[in-house]
Amino acid sequence: MKISIVGAGNAGCFTALYYSWYGRKKDLEVELIHDPNIAPQEVGQATLLGAPELLGTGFNYYDNHIHATPKTGILYEGFGKVNEKFIHAFPTNTLAMHFCPCELQKFALESGRFNVVEDNVDPKDVDADYVFDCRGTPKDFTGYTPLKSPVNAAILGKPKWDSKELWSRHVATPDGWAFVIPMDESSPSHNGAVGYLYNNKITKTEDAKKNFEQIFDVEVKRERTFKSYLHMNPIDDRVILQGNRLFFLEPM
């Protein structure tokens, strides 16, 4: 059986690593096709439990070429009516991780665990038994249903403090909430390790930026807007939508 993945963002890389690792003792060919001219995002990312074991195909925290940091849970600040802070702590015998998408991509493509093809293709034209479409956010939202979300914009910043905690932070703000991803200072994603989320139909970008800088000691780097959506037909014959090609909803 042959499985092809189109796209080398987070979803594409993790899908390829998953099938190459768990299918290594089976008659399974794994191929990742990507356009090298499309760069992955530089925003700091965080996984749930389980993802680090996929990187165990060649990753460890001693030879940490992707500058990942351990994630032991999620700290919520300012959301509780009784407690100012509360933590969703992971079991002590497990770990998730914080990572940079472009460094993860380089690691995955050079891992030697699957075939890599540089090309810009339509998933329906790929010769494989099953094809995962991981090409990221669509340009055409035909077939997608909007999802309700209180936020639709983000301001990204570089922390000016030592952000080496072993957990992600989600902080309630006057305009929505903010995430703080503890990234290695040498990682490109350190420039987008803090994100201030808000609704630009309610809060002006200038006001959100002012509040961001008042609450956090950051160097503002860039702004972006986004849609929240879900495709209603995730499987079309042998093509399966994955990652942001399937849906997007800003996590908390």
Briefly describe each language-model feature range:
Residues 1-11:
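Beta1/beta-strand and adjacent pyrophosphate-binding region of the FAD-binding site
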Residues 2, 27-31, 238:
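Residues at the starts of beta-strands that form the adenosine-phosphate
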Residues 15-28, 54, 111:
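A short, Lys/Arg-enriched amphipathic alpha-helix followed by its capping loop at the start of a domain
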